[in-house]
């Protein structure tokens, strides 16, 4: 008998890189709610500790609490590959258990900048975590992921490469690079499935950090550019990551959740 959709993540090992806040935390929480074994990673120990506290808060038994673990990982560090291997060793308990799904939601803040103010390091910094970090995560994931179409590796992109705007020259190409990377990795990691998810404007701590005191006004303006006249909600976007994890025929795809902004 086929496994029910609601049960497909039960006891599966899910690693969420960037899983301590915003969209990544929502993905981790959704996986925990589906009874998966979840490992979250972030660059700061305090963020990992806080996320673990929140994720474990609603779990009744010690066994359930033990399903949720975390480790630091700085994708911009000089020893990033060493840290990635340490994360995968930690998650898999030194190879005793294969990882079923990896979701990469990590990314440093991306700030729009006028073209005449752009410097080389703006693009380099924007790409460091989202593109280079993702590539290196994939490089080492091959050893730890279960080699099956039931397994997945999911990246996070965006929609600015499709619908660009002024001052996004150092930012928009990063989204395009992530999508291209996902499609290429789908070949390299096959039969493991690789996809990207492209959210539109989502109200998260990350967005508030970028927009600062203008966050509400910016979000309202972006909502007006959608067909739904709304902004995304992290918990709703997180469900798409779970769909990709549990649907064994989605591969090499980019899934857009933008309220219809691309066709508005």
Swiss-Prot record:
Annotated positions binding NADP(+): 23, 43, 74, 130, 139, 202, 204
Gene Ontology MF annotations: oxidoreductase activity
Entry-listed glycosylation sites: 125
Membrane topology, from the record: Single-pass membrane protein
Pathway assigned in UniProt: Mycotoxin biosynthesis
Record Pfam families: SDR
Enzyme class label: oxidoreductase
UniProt subcellular location: Membrane
EC number: 1.1.-.-
Name of the featured protein: Short-chain dehydrogenase/reductase ucsE
Source organism of this protein record: Acremonium sp
UniProt lineage: Eukaryota, Fungi, Dikarya, Ascomycota, Pezizomycotina
């Amino acid at each position: 008998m086929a496994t029910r959709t609601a049960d497909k993540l039960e006891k599966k090992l899910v690693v969420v890189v960037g899983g301590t806040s915003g969209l990544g935390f929502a993905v981790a929480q959704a996986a925990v709610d589906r009874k998966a074994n979840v490992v979250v990673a972030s660059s700061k120990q305090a963020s990992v500790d806080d996320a673990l506290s929140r994720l474990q808060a609603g779990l009744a038994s010690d066994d359930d609490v033990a399903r949720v673990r975390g480790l630091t990982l700085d994708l911009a560090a000089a020893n990033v590959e060493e840290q990635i291997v340490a994360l995968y060793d930690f998650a898999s308990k030194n190879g005793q258990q294969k990882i079923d799904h990896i979701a990469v939601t990590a990314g440093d803040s991306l700030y729009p900048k006028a073209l005449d103010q752009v410097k080389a390091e703006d693009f380099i910094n924007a790409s460091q975590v989202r593109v280079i970090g993702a590539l290196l995560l994939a490089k080492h994931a091959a050893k730890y992921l279960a080699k099956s179409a039931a397994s997945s590796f999911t990246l996070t992109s965006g929609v600015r490469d499709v619908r660009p705007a002024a001052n996004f020259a150092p930012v928009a190409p990063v989204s395009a690079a992530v999508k291209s990377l996902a499609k290429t990795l789908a070949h390299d990691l096959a039969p493991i499935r690789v996809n990207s998810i492209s959210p539109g404007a989502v109200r998260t701590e990350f967005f508030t950090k970028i927009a600062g005191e203008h966050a509400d006004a910016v979000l309202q303006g972006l909502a007006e550019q959608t067909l739904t006249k709304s902004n995304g909600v992290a918990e709703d976007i997180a469900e798409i990551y779970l769909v990709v994890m549990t649907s064994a025929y989605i591969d090499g795809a980019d899934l857009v959740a933008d309220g219809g902004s691309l066709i508005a």
